[in-house]
């Protein structure tokens, strides 16, 4: 087994295998702001699998997202009892939210991918890989040149990243996936 396989095995159950180091990380991350730029990836195996290389023009950002559903505003007018609910499920998954927040802070970059790095009872942390497509170190490399295409601009906001495609049901096709294309909104009437 190579190095990355061992790193991957550690993160199958980080509380057990990383122990005190994992707890210390979580405690430190709680004190930090929600979006922090990091020097090097916490999980090198996931970062390299998603296309990370230590080049100028590539950044890694750790994003904190609150877990759970969201509360709506209190309904002021009269309603029948069944309609009186304040909690609604999110329309997107937490990883997609983390990618969007990272990209809103770094508007000149595009999201390459993201991965889970930790969680506690209240928060989840994701590391998001951001690429500047107009940096010469990036657009001169064949593995990143596709980010220059017009249809990849603002890709995270249009559901084109891996985690967004997974949430939208676009990872599979054929039997059972008839109504996920072009989108759920196009196929299901409200």
From Swiss-Prot:
GO BP term (any one): cytoplasmic translation
GO cellular component: cytosolic large ribosomal subunit
Keywords: Ribonucleoprotein, Ribosomal protein
SUPFAM superfamilies, A to Z: Ribosomal proteins S24e, L23 and L15e (SSF54189)
Pfam short name (any one): Ribosomal_L15e
Keyword Ribonucleoprotein: yes
GO molecular function per UniProt: RNA binding; structural constituent of ribosome
InterPro entries noted in UniProt: Rbsml_eL15_core_dom_sf, Ribosomal_eL15, Ribosomal_eL15_CS, Ribosomal_uL23/eL15/eS24_sf
Matching SMART domains: Ribosomal_L15e (SM01384)
Family, as annotated: Belongs to the eukaryotic ribosomal protein eL15 family.
NCBIfam families named among the record's database cross-references: PRK04243.1
Protein name per its UniProtKB record: Large ribosomal subunit protein eL15
Native organism: Nanoarchaeum equitans (strain Kin4-M)
Higher taxonomy: Archaea, Nanobdellota, Candidatus Nanoarchaeia, Nanoarchaeales, Nanoarchaeaceae
Name of the encoding gene: rpl15e
């Amino acid at each position: 087994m190579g190095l990355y396989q061992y790193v991957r095995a550690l993160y199958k159950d980080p509380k057990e295998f990383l122990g005190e180091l994992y707890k210390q990380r979580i405690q430190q991350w709680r004190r930090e702001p929600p979006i922090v730029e990091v020097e090097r990836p916490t999980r090198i195996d996931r970062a390299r699998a998603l296309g990370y290389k230590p080049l100028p023009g590539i950044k890694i950002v750790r994003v904190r997202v609150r877990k759970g559903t969201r509360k709506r505003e209190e309904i002021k007018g009269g309603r029948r009892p069944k309609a009186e609910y304040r909690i609604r499920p999110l329309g997107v998954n937490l990883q997609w939210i983390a990618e969007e927040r990272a990209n809103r802070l770094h508007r000149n970059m595009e999201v390459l991918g993201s991965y889970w790095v930790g969680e506690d009872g209240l928060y989840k942390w994701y590391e998001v890989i951001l690429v500047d497509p107009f940096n010469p170190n990036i657009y001169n490399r064949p593995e990143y040149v596709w980010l220059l295409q017009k249809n990849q601009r603002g890709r995270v906001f249009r559901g084109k990243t891996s985690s967004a495609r997974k949430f939208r049901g676009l990872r599979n096709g054929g039997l059972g996936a008839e109504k996920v294309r072009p989108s759920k909104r196009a196929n299901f009437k409200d």
